From Swiss-Prot:
UniProt source species: Helicobacter pylori (strain P12)
Encoding gene per record: fmt
Matching Pfam families: Formyl_trans_C, Formyl_trans_N
Name the record gives this protein: Methionyl-tRNA formyltransferase
PANTHER family linked: METHIONYL-TRNA FORMYLTRANSFERASE (PTHR11138), METHIONYL-TRNA FORMYLTRANSFERASE, MITOCHONDRIAL (PTHR11138:SF5)
Domain of life where this protein originates: Bacteria
Family, similarity comment: Belongs to the Fmt family.
Alphabetized GO MF terms: methionyl-tRNA formyltransferase activity
Annotated Gene3D superfamilies: 3.40.50.12230
């Protein structure tokens, strides 16, 4: 079974690894298509996608392609690889009909479709406080995440997970699901999506990390969803790190400092309160909340803003 894999971030790398290391289904990954290396950090040094790094670090004999677009000659390159399947996981590009026609294109999408079509389904699960998390394999068509569902898997939330932890769990679940889908592809009954039930999620931007002390639960969920990037910050760009939801009922002044101790600062919201362990001002290192407040001469009863 010849597989061309299209994927870019760490989520995709987990699934690529499962395909490469799988010994049962006679799977051969014959090519990786991934995004181009991108400038990263203050020094803007080029950083390779995690999928590419995995192949290079393990010295795998898998050709890597990083095209700007998926037109010719890339279409012919794909044809020459003679794939039985094209697997797409968080690739970051829309596949044109010329590529969809080469072989069945299976997408691993981190939601229970038709819910959360688009670029940020895992963020949306967290932000919407979903009780059930899930993942789907889908036969791709020309529209965004609208193809027939092949298989899906889900689990009941037992505890709050941040983006990294939930992504990793769903990636491993997605790897198992994909292996099942590939093995059973020709006997699976495809399930058309109910497009009337579709919901969509947008690409996350820096501005999404802006928070205020209105709703404690909402602030806490944002801290989980945006932990890696863009993180959460106040209007003065003060970052709030390691946030815990304390309660979500009582009403306080917005940003009122209720308690300061070694664990952090307890801050009141219009609804509820949160404990913040660390605070980070622009261009500064993170400080324990207690030390930051001491430096600003903020005490209980004051306002964190």
């Amino acid at each position: 079974m010849r597989i061309v894999f299209m994927g870019t971030p760490g989520f995709a790398e987990v699934i690529l690894r499962a395909l490469v290391e799988n010994k049962n289904n006679h799977i051969e990954v014959v090519g990786l298509f991934t995004q181009r290396d991108k400038p990263f950090g203050r020094k803007k040094e080029l950083k390779a996608p995690e999928t590419k790094t995995y192949i290079l670090e393990n010295r795998l004999n898998i050709p890597i392609f990083q095209p700007q677009s998926l037109k010719e000659p890339e279409v012919q390159i794909l044809k020459d690889l003679k794939p039985d399947f094209i697997v797409v996981v968080a690739y970051g590009k829309i596949l044109p009909k010329e590529i969809l026609a080469i072989a069945p294109c299976i997408n691993v999408h981190a939601s229970l479709l038709p819910k959360y079509r688009g670029a940020s389904p895992i963020h949306e699960m967290i932000l919407n406080d979903d009780k059930i998390y899930g993942i789907s394999t889908m036969l791709m068509d020309l529209e965004l995440d609208s193809g027939d569902i092949l298989e899906s898997a889900s689990f009941l939330r037992e505890d709050y997970l941040d983006l990294d932890a939930l992504s990793l769990k769903l990636a491993h679940m997605g790897a198992t699901l994909l292996l099942s889908t590939l093995k059973n592809f020709h006997s699976i009954t495809r399930k058309p999506q109910d497009h009337t039930q579709a919901t969509f999620c947008k690409k996350i931007t820096k501005a999404d990390g802006l928070v205020g002390f209105k709703d404690a639960k909402n602030l806490f969920l944002k801290s989980l969803a945006f932990k890696s990037w863009p993180e959460i910050f106040l209007e003065n760009n003060l970052k709030l790190l390691e946030v815990e939801l304390v309660e979500n009922e009582k009403s306080h002044k917005e940003g009122e400092i209720l308690r300061i101790d070694e664990k952090g600062v307890l801050v009141g919201c219009l609804k509820g309160s949160v404990c913040i362990a660390w605070l980070q001002a622009v261009g500064k290192k993170p400080l324990k909340a207690k030390d930051y407040l001491n430096g600003k001469r903020l005490k209980v009863g004051g306002i964190l803003a």
